[in-house]
Design a protein with these regions (language model features):
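Bacterial N-terminal signal peptides
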Residues: 7-18
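SH3-family beta-barrel domains
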Residues: 18-38, 45-53, 58-101, 106-116, ...
């Protein structure tokens, strides 16, 4: 194998891995979802996840998914309680939602740590377009939120 062919093959494999390894986020779609320590209703109940809470899917086992929350806690939940709708949560002390993806754009609102925002568009560079439940939509820095 020539060096150029080796490099081309390595590049294709890295791109495939990056796609396969991309984080899979969902949000709690049911009014609430019970999270367990094992993939069965006979497992110990860890806590109740509220509607809209963003979660990262780590693994799938039948009708169950292993999840991670914003605090890094892991648990199991029935997949039927999750929604493909994407929400994010503010992880910084506060996040400024701006009119455009620019630090000099007008601030539309400030969201405190823990506030849920709907993900409107996928991440573009360092910014993400979000919407608050009050209808205010704008851009927030990706580093200030969790769930993307």
């Amino acid at each position: 194998m020539t060096i150029s062919r080796f490099i081309a093959t390595a590049a294709v494999l890295m791109l495939a891995c990056a796609h396969a390894c991309a984080a899979d986020f969902r949000s709690v779609g049911a009014p609430s979802v019970v999270l367990y320590d094992a993939p069965t209703v006979k497992g110990g109940k860890r806590y109740i996840a509220p509607h809209g809470m963003p979660v990262e899917i780590l693994a799938r086992y039948g009708d169950w998914v292993k999840l991670r929350d914003v605090d890094g806690e892991t648990a199991w939940a029935e997949s039927k309680g999750l929604s493909a709708r994407r929400n994010v949560v503010v992880k910084a002390a506060f996040a400024r939602v701006r009119a455009a993806a620019d630090d000099n754009a007008p601030i539309l609102m400030t969201a405190d740590k823990g506030v849920l925002l709907e993900l409107v568009d996928p991440q573009v560079s360092d910014w993400v377009r979000v919407r608050h439940q009050d209808g205010i939509a704008g851009f927030v820095r990706a580093a200030e939120i969790w769930g993307i």
